[in-house]
Amino acid sequence: SDWSSDVCSSDLTIIAHVDHGKTTMIDNLMKQSGSFRENEVVDERLMDSGELEKERGITILAKPASINWQDSRVNIIDTPGHRDFAAEVERVLSMADGALLLIDSAEGVMPQTKFVLAKALKQGLKPIVVINKLDKADQRANEVLDETFDLFVSLDANEEQLDFPVLYASGRSGWASKEVDGPRENLHPLLDLIIEHVQPAELDKTKPFAMLSTLLYADSFLGRNLVG
C-alpha cells in the first residue's frame, strides 16, 4: 500500500478528568470533520468500547480514531485519565505529537488532570487548552483558565508550554470559540487549531515501513486487528 502519501499525519492525545466531556467531544469532532457517511448510523460515546467503560463512562484502555481535516490526518488517542492506569498513560504519551487538555468550566482542574498533564509536560508536549461545558449555568471559565495557568507553572512547564492556546467550548452542543462570549457555531475553530498547533513527527519515507502499535483487538468479522 502507498504508505508514503503526502497527507500530513499527527497523533493527538486528549487529557481530561472523568465526566469533563472528553468522549462526547471526540464524538462531535469526528461527526463534524466528516468521518462518517451521511447514511451511517453512529452510536454515542464511540470511544467507550468496553462494557466497563460504557457503564462507568471512563477510559481504561487507550483507543485511536482518525479524522481528516484540511488535507491533514489527526489520529486522536482517547487516553486514560486515572493514575490507576499509569502504564497505559505513559504508553500513549510516548507516541503522541501533541495534547489537548479538556477542563470542565465549572469544576476546573482536578487531581487526575494534574497527574496526566505532568507526564505530558515532562514528555515535552505543548498542550492545547479547551475550557469545556461552557453552557453550564455555573461556569467560571476565566477563573478556571487562571487555575490552569497556575497548574502549568507548578508543574515546571517551560515558556513554550506556558504560552498555550485556549478555546472555550461545549462538546455536547458541538461548538468552540476563541472567546468566552464568541460565536457558538461549530467545532471548526478547534479542528483548525489542532492542525495549526500539532506538528507531525518527521518521517524518512525512504526507509521501510514501520509502525508503533496502539491497539490489538478481536473482531467477529475481521478477526484479529492491529492498529497503530
Task: Enumerate the language-model features and the residues they cover.
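P-loop NTPase switch module centered on the Walker A-proximal segment
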Residues: 5-103, 107-109, 116, 147, ...
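Alpha-helical scaffold segments in soluble metabolic enzymes
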Residues: 24, 28, 91, 115, ...
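Short acidic, glycine/serine/threonine-rich loops at helix termini
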Residues: 26-30, 88-89, 111-114, 138-143, ...
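N-terminal, positively charged nucleic-acid-binding surface of large information/translation enzymes
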Residues: 51-56, 60, 65-66, 116, ...
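A short, flexible beta-alpha/helix-coil linker loop
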Residues: 82-83, 134, 172-176
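Conserved C-terminal guanine-recognition region of P-loop GTPase G domains, centered on the G4
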Residues: 99-161
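Conserved catalytic-core segments of large NTP-driven translation/proteostasis enzymes
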Residues: 153-228
